[in-house]
Amino acid sequence: MKWETVIGLEIHAQLATRTKIFSGAPTAYGAEPNTQACPVDLGLPGVLPVLNREVVRMAIKFGLAVDARIAPRSVFARKNYFYPDLPKGYQISQYDLPIVEGGHLDIELEDGASKRIGITRAHLEEDAGKSLHEDFHGMTGVDLNRAGTPLMEIVSEPDLRSPAEAAAYMKKLHALVRYLEICDGNMQEGSFRCDANVSVRPVGQEAFGTRAELKNLNSFRFVERALEYEVERQIDLLESGGEVVQETRLYDVDKGVTRSMRTKEEANDYRYFPEPDLLPVEVDAALVDEVRETLPELPDEKRRRFEEEYGLPAYDAGVLTATRDMADFFEHAVSESGGFAKRTANLLMSELLAYLNKDGLEIAESPVTPEMLGKLVARVEDETLSSRGAKDVFEAMWAGEGEPDEVIEKKGLKQVTDTSAIEALVDEAIANNPQQLEQYRAGKEKLFGFFVGQVMKASGGKANPQQVNELLKKKLDGS
């Protein structure tokens, strides 16, 4: 029997506000445990939550970016459950009236085709605290710094049909929230987390199979691996006559397997009811229009523009628009170079990205600025510097040795473009290698590269390669 995979993702994006969703406590990551929780976050008696207006604006911004409906009226609800790091005994969330409904995101498939993934809803909620199991010798410590941190939960339709599609959707959403500057997307710090609902069904069957929810998916790679394992587990179970149980499963990163965590809860298990301490959220058209004015150029729009305006291949445009910082860096560098977009793209993708990856830096932390990269491109274009020399200059700039012109002068890398000087080197290379000359003229054309190498070696790598090729061709073929 052939099986079809059905996947829906629930993404929790931590909103990039300075203070929490219902209190004035800070949201900075990495502080000492329990130093950033106020009485509201701790659920102490006599205090009331006050909604952070910036959280609402961020949700609207996201909704507009995915072409969703912004609800004119949404309501907060209490989601009741017990957990040690949930001090109030309930989580303030949104249930039947979320702030964002509908919407979609287009992803690219492995074959280059595009697929539209529906977004069911996006709602606002507060995060819980964090249970710490290490270093407590059989006990559990609770850190409530994270309690009350604003989250937006983005729920997709069950439109994803493979683990690869799920990873592509997650990456696309990750790029979008960073472009919108509503979430920093730091997965190591838990700012962007994913739960996946997955089931399988016979191909052609309309009814969904029994689903399992997967937790602990904090990287794109883990999402794909966990889903691959779970799909295979469910198919093996069904084909051996067993039944899939609706449950929550945890992905074990070390073993590469999912294991049962608890029976999957239904909505009625949480006894949702409207939050009595918060008024409904009213969003008028004026606020939506105000937020719309702040929308940046979105990733898909920017990628298309890079292809059209700069003449870049689709792959290059995709790499350069992967993050807003990357795209801005590229455009500033192109402007500084005098408009040489393709060479700028090549240097950025080959040299800059390699050095960033090697040193574990974000592009905003690069010691080579857009202006420096643009000037380096300009020196290659005006033939002051060879393409090979550009790599040496980049390495020196990365090491903090100065601007391109300064490095070129200091290291003596200025390219030789004087025709008579290059011609003398060409004549010398031919005269010093009569045997190779005879073989070349006898039809061994691969020796052309040998002569190019001899000239470049004699010039210390400074001779203009194009001129070397032209003069050699003329003299070897014409003499």
UniProtKB/Swiss-Prot annotation:
One of its GO terms (molecular function) is glutaminyl-tRNA synthase (glutamine-hydrolyzing) activity. SMART domains: GatB_Yqey. Keywords: ATP-binding, Ligase, Nucleotide-binding, Protein biosynthesis. The keyword Plastid does not apply. Its EC number is 6.3.5.-. It catalyses: L-glutamyl-tRNA(Gln) + L-glutamine + ATP + H2O = L-glutaminyl-tRNA(Gln) + L-glutamate + ADP + phosphate + H(+); L-aspartyl-tRNA(Asn) + L-glutamine + ATP + H2O = L-asparaginyl-tRNA(Asn) + L-glutamate + ADP + phosphate + 2 H(+). One of its GO terms (biological process) is glutaminyl-tRNAGln biosynthesis via transamidation. Pfam families: GatB_N, GatB_Yqey. It comes from the Bacteria. Heterotrimer of A, B and C subunits. PANTHER family: GLUTAMYL-TRNA GLN AMIDOTRANSFERASE SUBUNIT B MITOCHONDRIAL AND PROKARYOTIC PET112-RELATED (PTHR11659), GLUTAMYL-TRNA(GLN) AMIDOTRANSFERASE SUBUNIT B, MITOCHONDRIAL (PTHR11659:SF0). Belongs to the GatB/GatE family. GatB subfamily. Allows the formation of correctly charged Asn-tRNA(Asn) or Gln-tRNA(Gln) through the transamidation of misacylated Asp-tRNA(Asn) or Glu-tRNA(Gln) in organisms which lack either or both of asparaginyl-tRNA or glutaminyl-tRNA synthetases. The reaction takes place in the presence of glutamine and ATP through an activated phospho-Asp-tRNA(Asn) or phospho-Glu-tRNA(Gln). This is Aspartyl/glutamyl-tRNA(Asn/Gln) amidotransferase subunit B. The gene is gatB.
